[in-house]
């Protein structure tokens, strides 16, 4: 096959090992698996509109999916008592204009999840997942275990910048080890429009205008991106229209028409919302991180 056709390929044995571990963790908790890849949507597919690729199906233009998380959220919202959570294995298409070799994949597999509860429950669950996979915990003097983490603004101050870049993620490994929880992202980093905002205490400059978002950095790369979802319908609509200075919504309107996009948004906002959280795991990066930590079997 031509080299181009190898884009996004993952070793089958590595893929089987990692997805089996992840499925075991979530099914033990009673989660249900969803197949979002065959579902058509605009909003549920688009995470970064600047990297959208499209296709024509039945005379309509659709985005190649970048995430399945809103479909997991849909399953949770339409029947809240059915399961404690949902997960899926999906393919993310990112038409990166300037991909960094070894860091950016333009097509890659993801494992995504949705749980009940807010950012505190999310952080606990992700810590449990990493421990289940085998990533080493740190230990306090009193015997309690933990993974290193801090708020985005604190880390930015530490490195003397406003926005963290790839080199700062790499530095986190040197400073703190293989796992770091980066939390509470400022709104100027353009968190996704349905992420919950930190509202208390607003008098704290540290938490002002920040989203309840956690990126788990594994061996210097963002490997899990996650957040608490918003329950505020008006705030979600406002964020949708204003993130990236309005560029996010305008790109979607230009590509798929304002009528279609607004119809999907209106339909989503009809749900009765409750505290919930979710995230996506880049499988190629998780495989990389597991190999670097000696958590993958040696090649046969």
Label every model-predicted segment.
Residues 50-117, 149-300:
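A translation/RNA-centric and nucleic-acid-associated enzymatic feature enriched
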Residues 119-124:
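Short, conserved charged micro-motifs
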Residues 34-37, 140, 300:
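Residue-level detector of family-conserved "landmark" positions at structurally sensitive sites
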Residues 134-147:
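Flexible helix-coil linker/hinge segments at domain or subdomain boundaries
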Residues 1-51:
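TRNA-binding/sensing appendages of the translation machinery
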Residues 125-134:
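Short amphipathic C-terminal alpha-helix that caps PH/PH-like domains
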């Amino acid at each position: 096959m031509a080299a181009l056709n190898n884009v996004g390929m993952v070793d089958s044995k590595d893929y089987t090992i990692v997805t089996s571990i992840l499925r075991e963790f979530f099914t033990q908790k009673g989660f249900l698996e969803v197949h979002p890849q065959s579902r058509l949507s605009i909003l549920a597919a688009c995470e970064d509109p600047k990297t959208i690729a499209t296709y024509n199906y039945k005379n309509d233009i659709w985005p190649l999916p970048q995430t399945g998380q809103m479909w997991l959220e849909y399953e949770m919202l339409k029947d809240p008592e059915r399961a404690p959570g949902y997960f899926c294995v999906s393919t993310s298409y990112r038409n990166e204009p300037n991909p960094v070799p070894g860091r950016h994949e333009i097509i890659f597999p993801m494992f995504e999840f949705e749980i009940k509860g807010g950012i505190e429950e999310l952080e606990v669950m992700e810590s449990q997942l990493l421990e289940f996979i085998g990533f080493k915990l740190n230990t306090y003097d009193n015997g309690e275990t933990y993974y290193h983490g801090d708020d985005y603004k604190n880390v930015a101050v530490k490195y003397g910048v406003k926005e963290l870049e790839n080199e700062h993620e790499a530095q986190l490994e040197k400073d703190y080890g293989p796992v770091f929880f980066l939390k509470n992202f400022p709104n100027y980093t353009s968190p996704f429009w349905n992420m919950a905002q930190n509202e208390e205490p607003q008098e704290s400059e540290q938490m002002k205008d920040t989203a309840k978002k956690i990126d788990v950095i594994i061996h210097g790369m963002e490997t899990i991106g996650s957040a608490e979802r918003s329950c505020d319908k008006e705030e979600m609509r406002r964020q949708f229209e204003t993130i990236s200075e309005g560029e996010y919504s305008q790109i979607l309107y230009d590509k798929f028409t304002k009528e279609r996009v607004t119809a999907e948004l209106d339909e989503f906002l009809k749900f009765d919302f409750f505290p919930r959280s979710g995230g996506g795991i880049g499988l190629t990066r998780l495989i990389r991180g597991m190999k670097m930590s000696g958590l993958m079997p040696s090649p046969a």
